[in-house]
Amino acid sequence: MNKYKKIKNNFDKEKKSYIVGFLFSLFLTIIPFFCTLNHLFSRKINFFVILLCALSQIIIHFIYFLHLDFSKKNSWNIISLLFILIIVFIIVFGSIWIMYNLNHHVIL
């Protein structure tokens, strides 16, 4: 197999991965819109449907667009992702904690 065919096969495989990821993402975006616009479920169930679709979409993006998997080759990428998630967790929940305490201690 010459170099051109190897590159073309790799490109076709990557293009297929992007198309599958896009279709999954599109499907996971349409489901919450359909459920909320047509009032299929109660508000609580709609919230959980939206949350489940959002978490599924995050996983789909990690797998199909960022190409993250648990192989030894990607171990540094996984470690970097975990570090970023910890930092985002600290920033978001720290901000919520600070705003709650500010709201609690404000004299009206």
UniProtKB/Swiss-Prot annotation:
Q: What's the protein's topology in the membrane?
A: Multi-pass membrane protein
Q: Mostly located where?
A: membrane
The segments annotated as topological domain Cytoplasmic are 1-16, 68-77
GO cellular component labels? cytochrome o ubiquinol oxidase complex; plasma membrane
Subcellular location, record wording: Cell membrane
Q: Which GO terms label this protein's molecular function in UniProt?
A: cytochrome bo3 ubiquinol oxidase activity; proton transmembrane transporter activity
> What Pfam families does this protein's entry cite?
COX4_pro
For biological process, the GO terms are:
aerobic electron transport chain; electron transport coupled proton transport
- Keyword Oxidoreductase, does the record have it? yes
**Disulfide pairings:** none
Where do transmembrane segments lie in this chain?
17-37, 47-67, 78-98
Q: Does the keyword Transmembrane apply?
A: yes
Q: Which residues lie on this side of the membrane: Extracellular?
A: 38-46, 99-108
Could you list this entry's UniProt keywords, alphabetically sorted. Cell membrane, Electron transport, Membrane, Oxidoreductase, Transmembrane, Transmembrane helix, Transport
Q: Which PANTHER family match?
A: CYTOCHROME BO(3) UBIQUINOL OXIDASE SUBUNIT 4
> What is stated as this protein's family in its record?
Belongs to the cytochrome c oxidase bacterial subunit 4 family.
Question: What job does this protein perform?
Answer: Cytochrome bo(3) ubiquinol terminal oxidase is the component of the aerobic respiratory chain of E.coli that predominates when cells are grown at high aeration. Has proton pump activity across the membrane in addition to electron transfer, pumping 2 protons/electron.
Subunit: Heterooctamer of two A chains, two B chains, two C chains and two D chains.
Which NCBIfam families does the record match to this protein?
CyoD (TIGR02847)
- Record protein name field: Cytochrome bo(3) ubiquinol oxidase subunit 4
Originating gene: cyoD
